[in-house]
């Protein structure tokens, strides 16, 4: 139903060129302090988009986002770990 999407992190020399990234995908976030932008495109097009972006003169570095490959369902702790008390560095004796 929905196409698989993947983020691409683009490190820039200057932020004034960040508007040019619109033609490569959907811009999700732009950091002014660290000078990078996160944009999303279809998962099938990630490799060719990264090559195109890396060839631009105002781009320092291009990295893929590994979020689609991370396991986001976490296991809960067992009852033994939940009920155990942790020492605070001193004894209450």
UniProtKB/Swiss-Prot annotation:
A Pfam family of this chain: DUF2129
Alphabetic keyword roster: Cytoplasm
Major localisation: cytoplasm
Compartments it resides in: Cytoplasm
GO cellular component: cytoplasm
Domain of life of the source: Bacteria
Disulfide bond entries: none
Classification via InterPro entries: DUF2129
NCBIfam families, sorted: PRK02886.1
UniProt family annotation: Belongs to the UPF0298 family.
Annotated protein name in UniProt: UPF0298 protein GWCH70_0997
Organism: Geobacillus sp. (strain WCH70)
């Amino acid at each position: 139903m929905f196409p698989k999407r993947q983020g691409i992190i683009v490190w820039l020399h200057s932020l004034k060129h960040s508007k040019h990234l619109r033609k490569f995908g959907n811009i999700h976030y732009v950091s002014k302090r660290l000078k990078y932008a996160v944009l999303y495109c279809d998962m099938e097009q990630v490799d060719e988009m990264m090559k195109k972006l890396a060839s631009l003169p105002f781009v320092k570095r291009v990295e893929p986002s590994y979020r689609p490959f991370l396991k986001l369902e976490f296991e809960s702790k067992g009852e033994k770990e939940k009920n155990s008390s942790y020492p605070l560095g001193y004894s209450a004796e």
